[in-house]
Regions:
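Short S/T/G/P-rich N-terminal loop/turn motif that feeds into the first structured element of a domain
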Residues: 1-72, 80-83, 110-117
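A generic structural motif
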Residues: 102-111
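Short, glycine/charged-enriched secondary-structure capping and boundary segments
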Residues: 31, 91-92
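Short amphipathic alpha-helices within nucleic acid-binding modules
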Residues: 83-91
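Conserved, mostly hydrophobic/aromatic
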Residues: 76
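A common structural junction motif
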Residues: 93-103
């Protein structure tokens, strides 16, 4: 098998990871509901900005409390043509009230060549 050098051309595959912080566990029900609504709005803004959601995954069926085995419980997979969409997404959460309750990280990769090649 020949392993070709990967391209770094759009669309970019982006994995957004979200986890609750200590603030989430100390928040009231109303604060959690507001944070959840705001997270949804922030993620929809990314789609309005050009991110194409491929899949979402919430790892809460067999886990309660702060995530320990993996540091995140919410995963959203996007394709984006412009990485500025991702920068705006991260900055939007960073500058919102949601940052008191949730943390977000984005990773840029590509489709797995042995499956999508």
């Amino acid at each position: 098998m020949e392993y070709a050098e990967p391209d770094f051309d759009p669309p970019y595959r982006v994995l957004v990871l979200v986890a609750a912080t200590d603030g989430w566990y100390g928040a009231s029900r109303e604060e959690r509901e507001a944070a959840t609504d705001e997270l949804g709005a922030i993620l929809r803004e990314a789609e309005d900005g050009g991110a194409r959601m491929l899949a979402s995954f919430d790892d809460d069926l067999f886990l309660t409390g702060q995530p320990a085995p993996l540091p995140y419980t919410i995963f959203v997979l996007y394709d984006v043509d412009d990485l500025a969409v991702v920068v705006r997404l991260v900055h939007r959460l960073r500058t919102s009230e949601v940052a008191r309750y949730l943390r977000l990280e984005a990773r840029v990769g590509r489709p797995l060549f042995v499956l999508d090649g």
